[in-house]
Amino acid sequence: MEEAIRSLQQEISDFGIQSNKDLEAFRLKYTVRKGLIADLFGQLKTVAPDERPRIGQLLNTLKKNADEKQTAAEAVFSAQAARKAPALDLTLPGRRHYTGSEHPVQKVLGDMKQIFHAMGFSIATGPELELDRYNFDLLNFPPDHPARDMQDTFFITRGNPSGDVLLRTHTSPVQVRVMLDNPPPIRVICPGKVYRNEAISSRSYCVFHQLEGLYIDKNVSFADLKATIFSFARQMFGKDVKLRFRPSFFPFTEPSAEVDVTCYLCGGKGCRVCKKSGWLEIMGCGMVHPNVMRDCGIDPEVWSGYAFGMGVDRTVLLRYKIDDIRLLFENDIRMLRQFPA
């Protein structure tokens, strides 16, 4: 056993390691778990008990010498590889790292909030899963109104004792909750997601973002409403923006109007986006209906108010001249990178 150890020690000393290939051959022959050194350690149990300490010490020395030779060779070859590697040119430009940015919908929504906040409006929010009572009943919707049909509204459950549960079709329920919980005067905006059972196209989507506003005080008039909308539009779209008010109907306002702006794509000449009209609707508005105020515990003989609501996504299309609303929901990185932080 001792002679085999000395012979292997001489063999290891004479082994020339001139390349990585030689180094790998050395490792496989001597230092791996099934190499020659490990075989000798396995034979240690056949040695007489009184000789085992001395033989074991010789084996440990053998293994140490082999490991040191292997480590020294690895260090040499590693240093040689480092010297051969191309030098780092510190004058080269760094690699570009793409940073995240605010989604255009959130950017526009933030700007809208800031504009109305400067006018004295506070922000109110509410649940997206809403009761029929808040979404329709308290907003003066008659029982047979088309909006209550399955074709227009996503109902979650129907026939519950507490009322039908649905995905809200507008953020008006938030206004109802504010009126029920707070005495006038009230001045709030209500941003959030809303859901409607609509066909998806370049102009409409089944989920979109909406911002509604409510102002209730004494002697509030339609002139106050127009002044608020004109001020908002000039700050949002520029001081030269053209607006058009059209008479309309909403169950929760009387009188009611819709507000249009000049089409952003054709400049009012007529195109497929504006359906050849030259105008695009941006919001609906009107004076809060007396029935709504009574149902919410506010006396319409003492108080008056206006309400308005607009699609945030459509405002994004107007500001950035995007011709397809679906682009806002696809999370296409090529489109989103056009709106850097």
UniProtKB/Swiss-Prot annotation:
Gene3D superfamilies: Bira Bifunctional Protein, Domain 2 (3.30.930.10)
Record-listed E.C. numbers: 6.1.1.20
Record's cofactor remark: Binds 2 magnesium ions per tetramer.
Record's keyword terms, sorted: Aminoacyl-tRNA synthetase, ATP-binding, Cytoplasm, Ligase, Magnesium, Metal-binding, Nucleotide-binding, Protein biosynthesis
GO biological process: phenylalanyl-tRNA aminoacylation
Predominant cellular place of this UniProt entry's protein: cytoplasm
Record's subcellular location: Cytoplasm
Transmembrane portions of the chain: none
One example GO MF annotation: phenylalanine-tRNA ligase activity
Catalytic activity: tRNA(Phe) + L-phenylalanine + ATP = L-phenylalanyl-tRNA(Phe) + AMP + diphosphate + H(+)
Positions that bind Mg(2+): E254
Record's GO cellular component terms: cytoplasm
Required cofactor names: Mg(2+)
Protein family: Belongs to the class-II aminoacyl-tRNA synthetase family. Phe-tRNA synthetase alpha subunit type 1 subfamily.
Subunit structure: Tetramer of two alpha and two beta subunits.
Name the record gives this protein: Phenylalanine--tRNA ligase alpha subunit
Taxonomic lineage from the root: Bacteria, Pseudomonadati, Chlorobiota, Chlorobiia, Chlorobiales
